[in-house]
C-alpha cells in the first residue's frame, strides 16, 4: 500500500515506536498498529493471522546502514530476520574466509532468513547490508516458541530442512538428479498449454458459473459445430464469448480485457481450444469448457441457475482482476517473433516496474521486451539449475519463491517475487555459484537466455557513440530509431537519431543546442528530450551555471570557415539559444522571480538580442516572444502584491479566500506559531522557503536567547523529529495535526503534544449526513483540483532529489499530499467518533457513495484516500458494522479495493488510468513512489558523467502531471448552478484525528475484540 509522503514519516515512526517497546509493554493498540504494517510486507503475506499476531508481540525493529555485517558464514545464529526495506548481499566462501567470498544473490524486500537458529547449525553464508535497510528481528527463544506452537502454519513458509517440500526429499542439500524433476533447457511454453497441473478451486468455480450463465441466458452459444468437414462437439466461438462477456458486466471495458479474462480459464485448463493449438483469441476459433469434454454433460439445475445469477458479478470481478496477468503471460509465452508492437509495449510497461531492471537503459528494456520468455513450473522441489553448471539464463521471479542451495551448506537463503538470480554467471561467464530449487508449487519466472543477453549488450555497445576529450568520455550517445517509420519520399529505412545517455553538463547542453530544429514551430520544438533537459538541469547544472553557459554560447564565434559560413553559424547558434531560453522561461514561469541570477540573465539576454536584432533581421521574428516573456516575468516580480504576501497561519488547507487559489512561492511570507516546552508559543514571520537555521534565528530574536536551540516536528501521537539546520520549507511538511516546537536540546525528551493536536471529540455526521454524496464529491474535486493545479512540475523534482539540495519549497506539493492524508483520516475519524451502530453503517454507505462519485469525476486522489480510510485497521476491524452493510455496497467496496490492489506495482490502478482522458486528478502518492523508485534505483552520476537516462525517466513521470492537466476541469453544470456554500466550507475545513493509536483505541471501545 502506498501512503502519502506527508504521513509516511509519522506512520513509520509510530509502528517503529511500538516495536521498540519491550514485548510485555505492548498494548493491543500497539499490536494492531504493528499488524497493519506487517500484513503489507511480502514476507508475511502467507502467514496465518494468529501467527502474525504473535510476531507482532515478540518482533524487534532494526535500522542498519550500508555495509553492516549481520553475521558471518560459520557463526552460530541468535536471530531470525525479515527484510522490510533495502537489500542485503549473500556472500559465500569455499574457504570460510571473507576475503574470497562470492556474492551469490541479493535479498530484497519481503525475504526472510535465519531459520538455522531452530537447531543451532552454523550460518551457511555471510549477510551484509547492500544499502540502508530495515529489518524485523525475532530472537531465538521467541522463534523456537513460535515454531513449537505454530509448526503446522510455519512448515510451508520456512526454507528447508524446516519447511515441507512436495518431493519429500531431504532438502538440506541438493536432491539426487535421478529423483528430482530437472528443467529441460530452452523448451518454449506454448500459449495454448495450461500452466497448472490441476485447476484451482476458484477458477473451476468461475468456469462453472460462466458455463451455467451461458446455458441459462444464451444456450445457442454452446453447440456442436462443423468446420472443414469435421464436427467439434459442444463448443463456443472466441468472438462470441468476448461479445457475451462485454454484455454481462460494466467492469469489462474492452475486448482486450475480455480476452485476458477468458485466458485465465484457459491457463488453468477450465476452458480449452478444441485442438489444444491456440491461446484464447478474439477470433473464429472453437473453445470448449472442461465440463463439456465429457459426453452428455449435464445442464444446470434451477438451483444452479439461481446460484449462477447470484455469483456472476463476483466471478466477473475476480476474472477482471486476474485477466491482466493472464494476458501478460499469454504474450510472454508467444515465440518472440510472433509478438506484435502492442505486445512489446505491454511487456515494456511491465518491465518499468521491476526493481531488478531499474538500472537498465530504456533501449535495453525495450530489447528485453522482445526476448524475455515466460517459464512456469508446477512442482515444488524442482531444480532450476545446479551449482557448477554453465550459466545459460538470467531469471526474475514473477510468482512464488526459490531456495538458494550450496553443496555441503544447504539452503543459504530464499528469494521471492521481484528478486532475480543467475545474472552474475552470464556477466562473468562463470559456473553457477549455487543451485536453485523451487520452494513451492506453481512458480513463474521471466527468463533471459545468454545469447539474447549478450546480443543486447553487443548491440547497445555497437550503437553507442562516445565523445572523448583528454582520453575521458565527455558525452555518450545512443543511436535509436527516430520513430517515424518511412519517409514520404518512399525510403523504407527507419531514420536514426542519437539520444543522450550520459555526459558532462556542458556537453549535454551543447548537444541539445546543436540539435534544436529551427524550422519547427515553438510548440513542435518542445521536443520531449529537450524538455527533459530543461526540466532536469537543476539537478546537475543549476541556473548559476546554465545562465553563463547560455550567454557564452550565444556570443560564440566559429574559428574556421569562410566569412559567410561563419556568419551563418553564428546566426543559427543565436537562434537556437533564443529558442532554448524561450522554452526554459516558459517551463519555469513565475519561479524565475525568486532567482536573482535568472532574472538578471533574462534582462541582459533580452538587451543583447535587441541590440543584435537591429543588425540581423533574422533575429527580429523571435524578439517579440522574448520581449513578452521577459516583460511579463519582470512586471509580475515588481507588482506590489508580489512583494510580501502573507499566507495563512499554520497553512490551513481550508483557506476560505474568495479569490482563486494562487500557488505558494518560496519568497511568500508566513505567520507561524512555534511552541515551547510549556506550550506557550511565539509567532514568527519568515519566507516559506526559510531554512531551519533561519527559523532558529527568528525564534531566538523573539525569545531573547537562542543558545543551543533545536527545532522539533511533533506529531499528535508524540513522535518527535529534530530538524536539520539545512532543512528548508518545513512548515508544510508537518502532519495534519503536527506542530513545530523550539527548545534547548536537553529539553527534547520533555516535549509533549498540545491538547489541541488530539483532534475532535465529536463527529460531524449530523452536519454532512444531510449533504448529498454527489455534492460532497463535487466540492471535494473542485478543491482538490485547485490544490493540484498549484503544484509546479519542478516541485516533483525538488521532492525526489531533496528540496534542501535546491533550497526550494515544495509547499504546493506538500499541501496536496497532506490533503490525501486529511481525507483518509476524515473517513476513519467520523466512523470512530460514531457510537451508534446503525449510524456507522450509514456512514460506510455514505463514504462508499462519495468514493464512487469522486471516481466519476476522475478525482482518483480523493477516491483512493476514501478507500484507504475504509481499509484502515480501525475501520476494517469493525466486524459488526461491516456485517450490516448491504451486499450491494460490499460489492462496490470490493471493486474499489481491487483498484487499489498493490500487486504487480499497482497494475490495476495503472490500467484504469491508462483508459482515462484528461482532466484527471491522479493518485499522487503512487506518482511520487514511481519517481523515488527511479531515483533510488539509478545513480545520478556514472563515472563522473550525468546519468541522463535517469533524468529522462524521472522527467517522463513528472510530465504525466502536465498531461493530466492538459484540459481544464469543466465544472458539472448541474452542480455549478447550485449554491452550496455550506458543502464548500465543510470539505475545505475537515477536522480530523491523525493519531492511529487513538483511532485504534476508539475502535476497540466501539467493538471490543471478540474472544
Swiss-Prot record:
Nucleotide-binding found in the keyword field: yes
Subcellular localization, as worded in the UniProt entry: Cytoplasm; Membrane
Tissue expression pattern: Predominantly expressed in brain and adrenal gland. Isoform 2 is expressed in liver. Isoform 1 is expressed in liver at very low levels.
GO molecular-function terms, A-Z: cAMP binding; guanyl-nucleotide exchange factor activity; protein-macromolecule adaptor activity; small GTPase binding
Domain notes: The N-terminal nucleotide phosphate binding region cAMP 1 has a much lower affinity for cAMP as compared to cAMP 2.
Coiled coil: none
InterPro entries given in the database record: cNMP-bd_dom (IPR000595), cNMP-bd_dom_sf (IPR018490), DEP_dom (IPR000591), Ras-like_GEF (IPR008937), Ras-like_Gua-exchang_fac_N (IPR000651), Ras_G-nucl-exch_fac_CS (IPR019804), Ras_GEF_dom_sf (IPR023578), RASGEF_cat_dom (IPR001895)
Domain DEP: 216-291
Record-annotated membrane-spanning stretches: none
Keywords from the UniProt entry: cAMP, cAMP-binding, Cytoplasm, Exocytosis, Guanine-nucleotide releasing factor, Membrane, Nucleotide-binding, Repeat
Gene Ontology BP terms: adaptive immune response; adenylate cyclase-activating G protein-coupled receptor signaling pathway; calcium-ion regulated exocytosis; G protein-coupled receptor signaling pathway; insulin secretion; positive regulation of insulin secretion; Ras protein signal transduction; regulation of exocytosis
Record note on quaternary structure: Interacts with RIMS1 and RIMS2. Probably part of a complex with RIMS2 and GTP-activated RAB3A.
Residues annotated to bind 3',5'-cyclic AMP: 422-425, 432-433
Bilayer topology annotation: Peripheral membrane protein
Protein name, UniProt field: Rap guanine nucleotide exchange factor 4
Main localization category: cytoplasm
CDD domains: CAP_ED, DEP_Epac, RasGEF, REM
PANTHER family, sorted: GUANINE NUCLEOTIDE EXCHANGE FACTOR, RAP GUANINE NUCLEOTIDE EXCHANGE FACTOR 4
Domain Ras-GEF: 772-1009
UniProt keyword annotation of Nucleotide-binding present: yes
Amino acid at each position: 500500500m502506498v501512503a502519502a509522503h506527508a504521513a509516511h514519516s509519522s506512520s513509520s515512526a509510530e509502528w517503529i515506536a511500538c516495536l521498540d517497546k519491550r514485548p510485555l509493554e505492548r498494548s493491543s493498540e500497539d499490536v494492531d498498529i504493528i499488524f497493519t504494517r506487517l500484513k503489507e510486507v511480502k514476507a508475511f503475506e502467507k502467514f496465518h493471522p494468529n501467527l502474525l499476531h504473535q510476531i507482532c508481540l515478540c518482533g524487534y525493529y532494526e535500522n542498519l546502514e550500508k555495509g553492516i555485517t549481520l553475521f558471518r558464514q560459520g557463526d552460530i545464529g541468535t536471530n531470525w530476520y525479515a527484510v522490510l526495506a533495502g537489500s542485503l548481499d549473500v556472500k559465500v566462501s569455499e574457504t570460510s574466509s571473507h576475503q574470497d567470498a562470492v556474492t551469490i544473490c541479493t535479498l530484497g524486500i519481503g525475504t526472510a532468513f535465519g531459520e538455522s537458529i531452530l537447531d543451532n547449525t552454523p550460518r551457511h553464508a555471510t549477510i551484509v547490508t547492500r544499502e540502508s535497510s530495515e529489518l524485523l528481528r525475532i530472537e531465538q527463544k521467541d522463534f523456537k516458541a513460535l515454531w513449537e506452537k505454530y509448526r503446522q502454519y510455519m512448515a510451508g513458509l520456512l526454507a528447508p530442512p524446516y519447511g515441507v517440500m512436495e518431493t519429500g526429499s531431504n532438502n538440506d542439500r541438493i536432491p539426487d538428479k535421478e529423483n528430482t524433476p530437472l528443467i529441460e533447457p530452452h523448451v518454449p511454453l506454448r500459449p495454448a498449454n495450461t500452466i497448472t497441473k490441476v485447476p484451482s478451486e476458484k477458477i473451476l468455480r468461475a468456469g462453472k458459473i460462466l458455463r451455467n450463465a451461458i446455458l441459462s441466458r444464451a444456450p445457442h452459444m454452446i453447440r456442436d459445430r462443423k468446420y472443414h468437414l469435421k464436427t467439434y462437439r459442444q463448443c463456443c466461438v472466441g468472438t462470441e464469448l468476448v461479445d457475451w462477456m462485454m454484455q454481462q458486466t460494466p467492469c469489462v471495458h474492452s475486448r482486450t480485457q475480455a480476452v485476458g479474462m477468458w485466458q485465465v480459464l484457459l491457463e488453468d485448463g477450465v476452458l480449452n481450444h478444441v485442438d489444444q493449438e491456440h491461446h484464447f483469441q478474439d477470433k473464429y476459433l472453437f473453445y470448449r469448457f472442461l465440463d463439456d469434454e465429457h459426453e452428455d454433460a449435464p445442464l444446470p439445475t434451477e438451483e444452479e441457475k439461481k446460484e449462477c445469477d447470484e455469483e456472476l458479478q463476483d466471478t466477473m470481478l475476480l476474472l477482471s482482476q486476474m485477466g491482466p496477468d493472464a494476458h501478460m503471460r499469454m504474450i510472454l509465452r508467444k515465440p518472440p517473433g510472433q509478438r506484435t508492437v502492442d505486445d512489446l509495449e505491454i511487456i515494456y510497461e511491465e518491465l518499468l516496474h521491476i526493481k531488478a531492471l531499474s538500472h537498465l537503459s530504456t533501449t535495453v528494456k525495450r530489447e528485453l521486451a522482445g526476448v524475455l520468455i515466460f517459464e512456469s513450473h508446477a512442482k515444488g522441489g524442482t531444480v532450476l539449475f545446479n551449482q557448477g553448471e554453465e550459466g545459460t539464463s538470467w531469471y526474475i521471479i514473477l510468482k512464488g519463491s526459490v531456495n538458494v542451495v550450496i553443496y555441503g551448506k544447504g539452503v543459504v537463503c530464499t528469494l521471492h517475487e521481484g528478486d532475480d538470480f543467475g545474472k552474475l554467471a552470464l556477466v562473468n561467464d562463470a559456473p553457477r555459484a549455487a543451485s536453485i530449487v523451487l520452494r513451492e508449487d506453481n512458480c513463474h519466472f521471466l527468463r533471459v537466455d545468454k545469447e539474447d543477453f549478450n546480443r543486447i549488450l553487443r548491440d547497445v555497445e555497437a550503437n553507442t557513440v562516445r565523445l572523448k576529450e583528454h582520453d575521458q568520455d565527455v558525452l555518450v550517445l545512443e543511436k535509436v530509431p527516430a520513430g517515424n517509420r518511412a519517409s514520404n519520399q518512399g525510403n523504407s529505412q527507419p531514420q536514426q537519431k542519437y539520444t543522450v545517455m550520459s555526459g558532462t553538463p556542458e556537453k549535454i547542453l551543447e548537444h541539445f543546442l546543436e540539435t534544436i530544429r529551427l524550422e519547427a514551430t515553438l510548440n513542435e520544438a518542445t521536443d520531449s528530450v529537450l524538455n527533459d533537459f530543461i526540466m532536469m538541469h537543476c539537478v546537475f547544472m543549476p541556473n548559476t551555471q546554465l545562465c553563463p553557459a547560455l550567454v557564452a554560447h550565444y556570443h560564440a564565434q566559429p574559428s574556421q570557415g569562410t566569412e559567410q559560413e561563419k556568419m551563418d553559424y553564428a546566426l543559427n547558434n543565436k537562434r537556437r539559444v533564443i529558442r532554448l531560453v524561450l522554452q526554459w522561461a516558459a517551463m519555469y514561469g513565475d519561479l524565475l522571480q525568486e532567482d536573482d541570477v535568472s532574472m538578471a540573465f533574462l534582462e541582459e539576454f533580452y538587451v543583447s538580442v535587441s541590440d543584435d536584432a537591429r543588425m540581423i533581421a533574422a533575429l527580429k521574428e523571435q524578439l517579440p516572444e522574448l520581449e513578452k516573456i521577459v516583460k511579463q516575468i519582470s512586471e509580475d516580480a515588481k507588482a506590489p502584491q508580489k512583494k510580501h504576501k502573507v499566507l495563512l497561519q499554520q497553512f490551513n488547507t481550508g483557506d476560505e479566500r474568495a479569490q482563486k487559489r494562487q500557488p505558494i512561492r518560496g519568497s511568500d511570507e508566513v505567520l507561524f506559531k512555534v511552541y515551547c516546552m510549556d506550550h506557550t508559543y511565539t509567532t514568527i514571520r519568515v519566507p516559506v522557503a526559510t531554512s531551519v537555521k533561519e527559523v532558529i534565528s527568528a525564534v531566538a530574536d523573539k525569545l531573547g536567547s537562542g543558545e543551543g536551540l533545536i527545532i522539533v516536528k511533533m506529531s499528535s501521537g508524540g513522535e518527535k523529529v529534530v530538524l536539520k539546520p539545512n532543512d528548508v520549507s518545513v512548515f508544510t511538511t508537518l502532519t495534519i495535526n503536527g506542530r513545530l516546537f523550539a527548545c534547548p536540546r536537553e529539553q527534547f525528551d520533555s516535549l509533549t503534544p498540545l491538547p489541541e493536536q488530539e483532534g475532535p471529540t465529536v463527529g460531524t455526521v449530523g452536519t454532512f449526513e444531510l449533504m448529498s454524496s454527489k455534492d460532497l464529491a463535487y466540492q471535494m474535486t473542485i478543491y482538490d483540483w485547485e490544490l493540484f493545479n498549484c503544484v509546479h512540475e519542478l516541485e516533483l523534482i525538488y521532492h525526489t532529489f531533496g528540496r534542501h539540495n535546491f533550497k526550494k519549497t515544495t509547499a504546493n506539493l506538500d499541501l496536496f499530499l497532506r490533503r490525501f492524508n486529511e481525507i483518509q483520516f476524515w473517513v476513519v475519524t467520523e466512523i470512530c467518533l460514531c457510537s451508534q451502530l446503525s449510524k456507522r453503517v450509514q456512514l460506510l454507505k455514505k463514504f462508499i457513495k462519495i468514493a464512487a462519485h469522486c471516481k466519476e469525476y476522475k478525482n482518483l486522489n480523493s477516491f483512493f484516500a476514501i478507500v484507504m480510510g475504509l481499509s484502515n485497521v480501525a475501520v476494517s476491524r469493525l466486524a459488526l458494522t461491516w456485517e450490516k452493510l448491504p451486499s450491494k455496497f460490499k460489492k462496490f467496496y470490493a471493486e474499489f479495493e481491487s483498484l487499489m490492489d498493490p500487486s504487480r506495482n499497482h497494475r490495476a490502478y495503472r490500467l484504469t488510468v491508462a483508459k482515462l482522458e484528461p482532466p484527471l486528478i491522479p493518485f499522487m502518492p503512487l506518482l511520487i513512489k514511481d519517481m523515488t523508485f527511479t531515483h533510488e534505483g539509478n545513480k545520478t552520476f556514472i563515472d563522473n558523467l550525468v546519468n541522463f537516462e535517469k533524468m529522462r525517466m524521472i522527467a517522463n513521470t513528472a510530465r504525466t502531471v502536465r498531461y493530466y492537466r492538459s484540459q481544464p476541469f469543466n465544472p458539472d453544470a448541474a452542480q455549478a448552478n447550485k449554491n452550496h456554500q455550506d458543502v464548500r466550507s465543510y470539505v475545505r475545513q475537515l477536522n480530523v484525528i491523525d493519531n492511529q493509536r487513538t483511532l485504534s483505541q476508539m475502535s476497540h471501545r466501539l467493538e471490543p475484540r471478540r474472544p
